[in-house]
UniProtKB/Swiss-Prot annotation:
The keyword Hydrolase applies. Belongs to the dGTPase family. Type 2 subfamily. This is Deoxyguanosinetriphosphate triphosphohydrolase-like protein. PANTHER family: DEOXYGUANOSINETRIPHOSPHATE TRIPHOSPHOHYDROLASE-LIKE PROTEIN (PTHR11373:SF43), DEOXYNUCLEOSIDE TRIPHOSPHATE TRIPHOSPHOHYDROLASE (PTHR11373). InterPro entries: dGTPase, dGTPase-like, dNTPase_2, HD/PDEase_dom, HD_domain, PHydrolase_assoc_dom. Keywords: Hydrolase. It comes from Thiobacillus denitrificans (strain ATCC 25259 / T1).
């Protein structure tokens, strides 16, 4: 039995269903079932060894795609509860949103997209959908995880029109310029809250950015000053974690207040109303600008730091080399991927590379290109 949600929330009892029909899984709701399938998937476990910003072996305490996804789910559930939305759907979308991400973060994605430019490109959101629709191999009756329509549309955050046209119903909203459920919108913004603030935390831990630099950023400086005023003797990591905690809380509360106002002003009463309205989940204009200022700071001072740039260059080289090797000679692929390559060509190669963890990609690169490992 589902809790009582807002009338415009997504109710699993009213789901638009799964591609392959299945009997109900009582006592779980359909969205709980989605979440459980995602958690038990191979792709979800691989996220433990996929980069957020820093390559996994650079340090044990830096975030990975797995810890990031868990943090997004936690933030998303908090927002959903405050807005009386379906927490299970928000959690499912949050946990699955990065399943299609390449090794080495955005550097890996950019490199693979460049390799696939003449073959449809590579979008990690589209790849996440491909993972849950096709690539996971767990069930006797179907490929993929056979998730509900609502979970699948939430995973597909962005999609080029050329690709949307090939996806049928789940890609239709990009063509019709409609919105996904509020739960999907919340999961998207929870992702932004999580990665900005946790990249701040990891950036400070790495020493690539400093508190002094961040104090010039409006939203961080304001909360840092509050922490120092309230806890004048606080030192070290506790200053950072207390500041980041306060920023996350402030962003959540602003998002909830602004979204509530948007819902009231728009007059939405049903999920269909949500789909036909402008985006409803949002930050206030003032907080949105402060959030963007923080993103700009991270872009210039962390993501473009020369040490991160060096890691990104190496990562791009590994991905490009692997793609060249596998498309140049399919015999270098493992047997099961050779079979898929003979049917799907370069897309099967992209699937194989995108599914690698950071360390597996580095190992495969050494096996193919390092002459000292000729017998590996």
């Amino acid at each position: 039995m589902e809790p009582s949600f807002a009338p415009y929330a997504a109710h699993s009892s009213q789901t638009r269903g799964r591609v392959h029909r299945e009997a109900p899984a009582a006592p779980r709701s359909e969205f709980q079932r989605d979440r459980d399938r995602i958690i038990h998937s191979t792709a979800f476990r691989r996220l433990e060894y996929k980069t957020q910003v820093f390559v996994n072996h650079e340090g044990d305490l830096f975030r990975t795609r797995l810890t990031h996804s868990i943090e997004v789910a936690q933030i998303g559930r908090t927002i959903a509860r405050l807005l009386n939305l379906n927490e299970d759907l928000v959690e499912a979308v949050a946990l699955a949103h990065d399943l299609g991400h390449t090794p080495f973060g955005h550097a890996g994605q950019d490199a693979l997209n460049a390799c696939m430019r003449e073959h449809g490109g590579f979008e990690h959101n589209l790849q996440s959908l491909r993972v849950v629709d096709l690539l996971e191999e767990r069930y006797a009756e179907f490929d993929g995880l056979n998730l509900t329509f609502e979970a699948r549309e939430g995973i597909l955050k962005h999609c080029a029109l050329s690709n949307a046209e090939k996806l049928g119903e789940v890609g239709r909203r990009f063509i019709d310029k409609k919105q996904p459920s509020l739960e999907a919108q919340v999961a998207n913004l929870a992702d932004e809250i999580a990665y900005n603030n946790h990249d701040v935390d990891d950036g400070l831990r790495s020493g690539l950015i400093t508190l002094e630099q961040l104090s010039e950023v409006t939203i961080f400086g304001r909360h840092l000053a509050e922490v120092r005023r309230k806890h004048p003797t606080l030192q070290g990591r506790r200053v950072v974690t207390e500041t980041v905690r306060r920023i996350i809380n402030a962003l959540i509360l602003d998002l909830v207040d602004t979204t509530r106002t948007n819902v009231v002003n728009s007059g939405v009463e049903t999920l269909d109303d949500v789909r036909n309205a402008p985006p409803l989940a949002a930050f206030s204009p003032a907080i949105l600008e402060q959030h963007r200022e923080l993103k700009r700071f991270l872009l210039h001072h962390l993501y473009r730091h020369y040490k991160v740039a060096r890691m990104s260059t190496k990562a791009g080289r590994i991905i490009s080399d692997l793609y060249a090797a596998f498309t140049g000679d399919a015999r270098l692929l493992p047997p099961e991927h050779q079979a898929r390559e003979s049917l799907e060509g370069t897309r099967a190669v992209a699937d194989y590379i995108a599914g690698m963890t950071d360390r597996y990609a580095m190992r495969e690169h050494r096996r193919i290109y390092a002459v000292e490992e000729i017998y590996d």
